[in-house]
Amino acid sequence: MLHTAFTDLVGCDVPIQLAPMGTIATPELMAAVNRAGGMAMTGMPGAPAAVVAEALDAVGASVAGAFGFNVVMPFLDLEVVDTAAARCRVVDFYHGAVATSLVERVHAAGALAGWQVCSVNDARAAADAGCDLLVVRGTEGGGRMHGGQSLWPLLTAVLDAVDVPVVAAGGIADGRGLAAALAAGAAGVRMGTRFVATPESGAHPEYKDAIVRAGAGDTVLTDEFRVEWPDSIVSSRVLRSAVEHAAELPDDAVTARVAMGPMTIDVPKFGVVPPTTAAEGHIAAMALYAGESAALVDLIEPAEDIIARIVRQAEGQLRSVMPS
């Protein structure tokens, strides 16, 4: 029942896509999502092509099925685009003007091209540029934000405006959300926050626990977590507690130290780096990216179990409102 234009296009079994969450979306999490029938995404903003190639080769060796790579436009590196397109089923772009040349570049390497959009105008531009699929993201979503519309009105408007598969993102964490998106006409959903709270994710245990504890109203759209980030990327949705804890630190504080391979980096107050298992310091004051769907997360559980339950819920919900 849940085969859609998205699953047919990318070659997965269920219309659930893992959001590209950088170091949080570990190869283990990506592999688990794909084993459950979904499609994993990753992203490495600012990383050079050689590092991206090594990381994607490692992912390809451990992840069965199609996976994709997200490019954040202020960090655009054409060599990275080529590297990802040669290794991934999908390369999608976010936080910048739609460029036909990038879509053509991805296609030339044999990959599908996508664009994450936050307005109807961007959706039309992406479809006109030849994108194979779009991700429509509402302000309910966690992490970096570009746009100001909530998901459901935006999704409806985009579906009326374009004729390519559309994936809905922002505030979705269960089978009802998936069913609602499919019933509205979307071809799938992209989820991030729900998968942070999994054993496979790279999130620090305190980060996972904070999401599980979060309730309605416990996230906030803020421009605080932007230190050492391009000026064009302003807002992000995080747990409200992260803003409160960070505000208590001195302006020159080192919030945490995070090991990244052979290096250890200092994370400043309101720095953009989220806490991974390799972080030490004021974890509660780091960028705890989370969408409004955090209120629906009450347990840390394996990604495969999450997807299986979401699919069952969605199928049951769709049958209940559209009986045969």
Tell me the role of every PLM-derived stretch:
Residues 1-165:
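Active-site entrance/lid segments in N-terminal catalytic domains of soluble metabolic enzymes
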